[in-house]
């Protein structure tokens, strides 16, 4: 799987999530509530987008490093495994470890964790699964140049949707 494919997929998955939380008035029952997510994007803008996209990108990349022969469903399972470990470790060490007021981004994560609970794990698993599937599909269907164009278009689109009410 090409790095540009993973990046493009992560950008478009984050775009889809942002479109969902900005357009759908009430959350889907198995996904976390959107109050803290809306605050996350409103307060931190493109830094929030960058953190989300990099988390997805690095999660898939780390899964491919840890499980070098994994492809298809195996890579999806590896990526979900890495994402779950990340989420749990991040919650226990960073979110619970830092006192309120020390880091404004982590303060929003504290609210998000309280608001979303286990549903965050489901949402993150769906997101990372979507990144793996979309990246693989892009590798099969498109040239490197086309995927690079898609990635740039994804970045461009994220800039605008980030500041959409």
Place the predicted regions along the sequence by residue.
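Juxtamembrane/disordered regions of integral membrane proteins
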Residues: 1-118, 129, 133-165
């Amino acid at each position: 799987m090409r790095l540009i494919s993973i990046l493009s997929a992560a950008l478009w998955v984050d775009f889809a999530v942002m479109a969902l939380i900005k357009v759908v008035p009430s959350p889907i029952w198995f996904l976390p509530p959107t109050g803290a997510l809306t605050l996350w994007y409103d307060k931190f803008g493109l830094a929030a987008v960058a953190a989300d996209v990099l988390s997805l990108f690095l999660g898939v990349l780390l899964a491919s490093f840890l499980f070098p022969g994994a492809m298809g469903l195996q890579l999806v399972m590896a990526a979900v495994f890495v994402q779950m470990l990340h989420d749990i470790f991040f919650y226990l060490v960073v979110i619970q470890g830092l006192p309120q007021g020390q880091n404004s981004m982590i303060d929003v994560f504290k609210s998000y964790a309280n608001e979303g609970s286990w549903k965050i794990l489901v949402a993150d698993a769906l997101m990372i699964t979507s990144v793996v599937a979309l990246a693989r599909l892009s590798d099969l269907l498109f040239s490197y140049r086309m995927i690079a164009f898609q990635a740039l278009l994804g970045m461009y689109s994220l800039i605008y949707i980030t500041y959409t009410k």
